[in-house]
Swiss-Prot record:
GO terms for molecular function: D-serine ammonia-lyase activity; hydro-lyase activity; pyridoxal phosphate binding. One of its GO terms (biological process) is isoleucine biosynthetic process. This is D-serine dehydratase. It comes from Citrobacter koseri (strain ATCC BAA-895 / CDC 4225-83 / SGSC4696). Its EC number is 4.3.1.18. The modification N6-(pyridoxal phosphate)lysine is found at K118. Monomer. Pfam families: PALP. PROSITE patterns: DEHYDRATASE_SER_THR (PS00165). Belongs to the serine/threonine dehydratase family. DsdA subfamily. The keyword Nucleotidyltransferase does not apply.
Length: 442
């Protein structure tokens, strides 16, 4: 971006200066609206999410047999909630900031099949595509027991089709493993920052991995191009996919049920704050949408990004969305949080969710590593760096009187709050890789 343009951008949007300087930055969104007002801009409805629920229920018998680790939950891919009081105390001690209310961790990091939040959206979109093909071919009705899809006839049928996706790692892992299981030929286009073990795991499932020296945007573009030349190839578009988004959105109702089981109340007097790591935006966007449908105006969602990859904060804050990249403001998009190393946000997600987000913030890789170490020490829970992005959120909210006044929160409401940090990945990180992560924390 030329100097004059940059000067005028900073004059209009002063926080851009902090993003350029790679400072840890918090932006509380002055443009939030009620769910009723913001919902029409999403372009998807509660019925769409209900349909996704129903589809996953139809596939449950298939998943229970195809992936024995899901048998205990009857083929439903869901993660547990952990209350983390020792981590809450450690954060208060390290940062000198009391966290009012209770701190919880949503362990999507330990979801079955692929060990990340992407087991929600990625697997859902592959299943939705398989169902569509099988229904159109007359091989299946929605009344059938979907475990018939494990038969050789079905695998033979699916083998004439292929799937392509561009990914920094976890989405590729979910889509690759699921597609290979169904019988699709699958190619994952991986960006330079993808971890070697994720590529190796995919190849062990018979997935074709194409590696690029460039970043995420290039991998997605190449994947899209390759798929265009083959009518039997379906490209899963992480930047624009409504189907992926709905796969994530199912998490809202599921969390509501988990809270009900625990007797945990969410209402005006007991607000829920949720902190979601954000890369291109599909995962956190879909989950936040589902949470809003489940809890309405009593849930407050925040996206968390690395200081080196603040694409969604930049896009939503300036209103430029996918018309601007972090590279254009001189930020390098190089971060240890490989799942969040995205330079240009999804325009679909930014525009859909900009009224329903309470804020976005950035944190340094160093901060992620520190918190990774503390969580392992205090709670015995091991995550990958990007999964800690949400852990910095509760202090930012509890520290900001401006934000509390903006939403007229009383001290009593905050004392009754639930702070939920969404842990997005790390359950399948190899031991030696995890040891390197732990060595970097203080």
């Amino acid at each position: 971006m030329e100097n004059a343009k940059m000067t005028s951008l900073i004059a209009q949007y002063p926080l851009v200066e902090d993003l350029i300087a790679l400072k840890e930055t918090t932006w509380f969104n002055p443009g939030t609206t009620s769910l009723a007002e913001g919902l029409p801009y999403v372009g998807l409805t509660a019925q769409d999410v209900q349909d996704a629920h129903a589809r996953l229920a139809r596939f449950a018998p298939y998943l229970a047999k195809a992936f024995p680790e899901t048998a205990a939950t009857g083929g439903i891919i869901e993660s547990e909630l952990a209350i983390i009081p020792a981590m809450q105390q450690r954060l208060e001690k390290e940062y000198g900031q009391k966290i009012s209310g209770e701190l919880l961790l949503k362990k999507d990091s330990h979801l079955p099949i692929s060990g990340s939040i992407k087991a929600r959206g990625g697997i859902y979109e592959v299943l939705a595509h398989a169902e569509k093909l099988a229904l159109e071919a007359g091989l299946l009705t929605t009344e059938d027991d979907y475990s018939v899809m494990l038969s050789p006839e079905f695998r033979q049928f699916f083998s004439q089709y292929s799937i392509a996706v561009g990914s920094t790692g976890n989405l590729g892992l979910s889509i690759g493993i699921m597609s290979a299981c169904i019988g699709f030929k699958v190619t994952v286009h991986m960006s330079a920052d993808a971890r070697a073990w994720k590529k190796a795991k995919l190849r062990s499932h018979g997935v074709t991995v194409v590696e690029y020296e460039e970043d995420y945007g290039v991998a997605v573009e190449q994947g899209r191009k390759a798929a265009q030349s083959d009518p039997n190839c379906f490209f899963i578009d992480d930047e624009n996919s409504r189907t992926l988004f709905l796969g994530y959105a199912v998490a809202g109702q599921r969390l509501k049920a988990q809270f009900a089981q625990q007797g945990r109340v969410v209402d005006a007097d007991h607000p829920l704050f949720v902190y979601l790591p954000c890369g291109v935006g599909g995962g956190p966007g879909g989950v936040a949408f589902g949470l809003k449908l489940a809890f309405g105006d009593n849930v407050h969602c925040f996206f968390a990004e690395p200081t080196h990859s603040p694409c969604m904060l930049l896009g939503v804050y300036t209103g430029l969305h996918d018309a601007i990249s972090v590279q254009e403001i001189g930020v390098d998009n190089l971060t240890a949080a490989d799942g969040l190393a995205v330079g240009r946000a999804s325009g679909f997600v930014g525009r859909a969710m900009e009224r329903l987000l309470d804020g976005l913030y950035t944190l340094d890789d160093r901060t992620m590593y520190d918190m990774l170490g503390w969580l392992a020490q205090e709670e015995g829970i091991r995550l990958e760096p990007s999964a800690l992005a949400g852990m910095a959120g509760p202090q930012r909210v509890c520290r900001s009187t401006d934000y509390q006044q903006m939403h007229a929160f009383s001290a009593e409401q905050l004392n009754h709050a639930t702070h939920l940090v969404w842990a997005t990945g790390g359950g399948m990180v190899p031991e030696e890789e995890m040891a390197q992560y732990l060595a970097k924390g203080r």
